[in-house]
């Protein structure tokens, strides 16, 4: 995934990744990309989502080469500081494109001594002092959380209403079930 300047390290990393996927996954590998928005991931102090995409390609390729039918199970968070409804709509589009029906999800829970909790509590990023939006009310949290479940017919009407509310942004790739 992360290419170093040392070819031996890169080779060792590839061998380790293949060994992990081919020999040490018992059907499902749970990973935590946590979000698709690079802006939100930056606040989380995590790498860009493209790195997860690269890993998924490697995972799928090794599964195909080894004749395996394993699943990659991603874990995502809604209502994280910096996350808005538009980010969650985009998350729905991306996870649909990747053919994920999300189940491993959670709303952000503030925990002591973290950058995210500081931003959530104060409304400012502690390092940059830039304002940071945080969903705090039940309505704001549900407005974000529903996008995890774009594939559920019972969520269709609420998601469409939320897309209309957030404005002119087009999410034409998010074809909801009827």
Regions found by a protein language model. Name each.
Residues 1-73, 77-81:
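Conserved SAM/AdoMet-binding glycine-rich loop
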Residues 172-178:
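Conserved small/polar residues in nucleotide/adenosyl-binding loops
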Residues 105:
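Active-site-adjacent helix-turn-beta-strand microarchitecture at beta-sheet edges
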């Amino acid at each position: 995934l992360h290419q170093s300047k040392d070819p031996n390290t890169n080779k060792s990393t590839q061998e380790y990744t293949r060994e992990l996927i081919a020999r040490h996954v018992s059907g499902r590998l749970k990973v935590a990309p946590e979000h698709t928005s690079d802006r939100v991931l930056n606040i989380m102090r995590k790498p860009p989502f493209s790195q997860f995409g690269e890993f998924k390609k490697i995972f799928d390729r090794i599964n195909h080469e080894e004749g395996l039918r394993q699943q990659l199970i991603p874990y995502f968070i809604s209502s994280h500081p910096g996350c808005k409804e538009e980010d969650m709509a985009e998350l729905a589009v991306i996870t649909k494109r990747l053919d994920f029906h999300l189940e491993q999800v959670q709303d952000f829970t503030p925990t002591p001594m973290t950058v995210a909790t500081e931003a959530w509590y104060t409304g400012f990023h502690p390092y940059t002092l830039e304002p940071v939006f945080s969903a705090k009310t039940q309505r704001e949290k549900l407005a974000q959380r529903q996008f995890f479940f774009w594939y559920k017919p019972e969520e269709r009407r609420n998601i469409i209403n939320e897309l209309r509310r957030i404005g002119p942004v087009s999410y034409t790739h998010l074809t909801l079930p009827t």
